[in-house]
Amino acid sequence: MCYFNSINLNIGEVIKISKKEKKIDRQIKSNVTSGFEFMQWPIIKEDPNSADLLLEMAHWEFIPSWIHNNKELETSREKFTTLNAKGENLLESKMYRDASLKRRCIVLSSGFYEWRHYKPIGAKKENAYPYFITIKDKPVFFMAGIYQPWTDKNTGETIDSFAIVTSAANTLMSKVHNKKKRMPTILSESLAHEWIQDELNESRIKEIANFQLDDEDMEVNSIRKDFKISAYPQEKFIYAELPSLDQSEGFSNELPFV
């Protein structure tokens, strides 16, 4: 699942989706953000009052309508997480159906993080190796999202909350995120445009929500295990004991006995 993300938007940069665009008027930068920090994150929506796109900083964590205040929200976090929403279940889910039909958005990203599990030869247990994943020639790319306006009944404050839509992993991501074999639903510009249109039928919503980006469009690199506190979290790091992704998990550099 996608729980760690990065973003790098510079002032003056233009986000384009089809014929619509949004010029960035402030720097938005985070090398590593954990969804479990429940921070604000940039999303793109259709602007009903303009021909351009609407960029908004929204709360990363889909908050269902039956949660009434912050105390209930904190209690719910002990039972389930709503940082991600499975594309296969969007329209069957009581929590996500209405948003999937009426409130779809684009979550902006410059790269995300996942863990590959591997048991080195001679080790007693599997180790988790972090990877940083980007899209070739796309400094900023588009993840499918759904959003939910939520009002804290105690304070009266209203915010937009959102979840990143995920799909079954493609071949490459199945090797990286090899436990759960999931990935964020990453959309081309044309699919991103379609995703945020009002008139999508249920069949098309399901198709786009479960879209798998081609392996060839992605770049993946192993990084240091302490990347979350590193000054250079996205820097490539090679583990001597870890076979490359195009080798079998049981690969050994040792010569066989003859």
Question: At which residue positions do the language-model features occur?
Answer:
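Short linear sequence motif anchored by a di-proline
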Residues: M1-V258
